[in-house]
């Protein structure tokens, strides 16, 4: 796992062999293509524009969607509070908000179809396994 990406996301340096990805989760179909990550603070792992800040009526948590480029978006979900608003341009390491009960969900979306559709504002996106991004195998400038 690429500790640089994860350290940026959680806002601190990981200690040797520390695993912040919640066991039993991961980027697979069982979690609708997202990784749950143990953290208090949530920081941006890339530059982009906040296109959506939505509140989930069931969990009463926030989800922030960031447009990275014409084909890629990242979502930071299960946030108890957020520090950004729609239209904000953010940079890598900028604070997004705080995780709900020290657990947030990171999602990677593109316009390429998958079995996990998600509607963001008026756009249909599709979730994909975020593990390659978190591991450093896939850069956000590359498209799956």
PLM feature segments, named:
Residues 1-63, 91-92, 101, 131-144:
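Surface-exposed, glycine-biased beta-strand/turn segments
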Residues 22, 77, 107:
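Residues in well-ordered beta-strands of folded domains
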Residues 38, 43, 53, 68-95, ...:
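Short histidine-centered loop motifs in beta-beta connectors
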Residues 88-144:
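Conserved, short, structured surface segments that act as functional micro-motifs
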């Amino acid at each position: 796992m690429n500790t640089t990406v994860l350290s940026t996301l959680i806002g601190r340096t990981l200690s040797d062999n520390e695993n912040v990805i919640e066991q039993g989760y991961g980027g697979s179909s069982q979690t609708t293509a997202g990784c749950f990550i143990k953290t208090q603070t949530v920081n941006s792992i890339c530059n982009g524009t906040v296109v959506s800040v939505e509140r989930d009526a069931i969990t009463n948590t926030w989800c922030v969607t960031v447009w990275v480029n014409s084909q890629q978006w990242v979502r930071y979900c299960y946030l108890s509070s957020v520090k950004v608003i729609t239209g904000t341009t953010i940079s890598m390491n900028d604070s997004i908000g705080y995780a709900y009960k020290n657990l947030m969900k990171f999602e990677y979306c593109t316009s390429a179809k998958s079995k996990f559709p998600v509607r963001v504002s008026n756009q249909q996106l599709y979730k994909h396994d975020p593990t390659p991004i978190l591991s450093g195998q896939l850069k956000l400038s590359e498209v799956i």
